[in-house]
């Protein structure tokens, strides 16, 4: 019977459900396609965001407010993108234990999810791929380490 709960490692799980490995997707941010980088920067600063990476001269800024990250990108893509960075925490600092983007790619493929774009190089290090959710929202898995 699946209606009974059993505590496991401080979490509640169904008693008879087979669990699978939870993917470690890394740092989450939303990458916003903006029309005017300076105006967008000024707007987000008014609501508490601060620049912590990127360069206006390169057409992008990464901004942070507490544990929330946003990227402002002018002229780089058409739609907003949900972005995950394996190997980074929410402060864009390297973490020791993470699922490599190549492993995540195989897990995603094994679930029957279509890969929209794939840019994998070598057996480790920076690489990326993207998928599209059922509503057409792009999701980028982008490893920098």
Residue locations for each model-derived region?
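N-terminal beta-strand motif that seeds the catalytic metal site of vicinal oxygen chelate
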Residues: 11-41, 144-145
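Core segments of cupin and vicinal oxygen chelate
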Residues: 24, 31-76
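Vicinal oxygen chelate
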Residues: 35-38, 76-77, 85-135
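Residue-level structural signal for beta-strand termini and adjacent loop
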Residues: 57, 75, 121, 142-144
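Conserved beta-strand in the GNAT
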Residues: 70-73, 130, 139-140
């Amino acid at each position: 019977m699946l209606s009974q709960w059993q505590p496991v490692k401080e979490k509640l799980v169904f008693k008879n459900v087979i669990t699978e490995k939870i993917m470690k997707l890394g740092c989450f941010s939303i990458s916003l396609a903006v029309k005017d980088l300076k105006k967008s920067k000024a707007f987000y600063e008014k609501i508490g965001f601060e620049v912590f990476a990127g360069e206006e001269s390169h057409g992008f800024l990464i901004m942070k407010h507490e544990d929330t990250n946003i990227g402002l990108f002018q002229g780089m893509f058409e739609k907003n993108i949900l972005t995950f960075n394996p190997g980074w925490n929410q402060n864009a600092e390297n973490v020791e234990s993470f699922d490599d983007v190549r492993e995540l790619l195989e897990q995603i493929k094994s679930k029957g999810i279509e890969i929209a774009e794939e840019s994998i190089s070598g057996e480790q290090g920076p690489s990326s791929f993207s998928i599209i959710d059922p509503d057409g929202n792009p999701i980028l898995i982008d490893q920098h380490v």
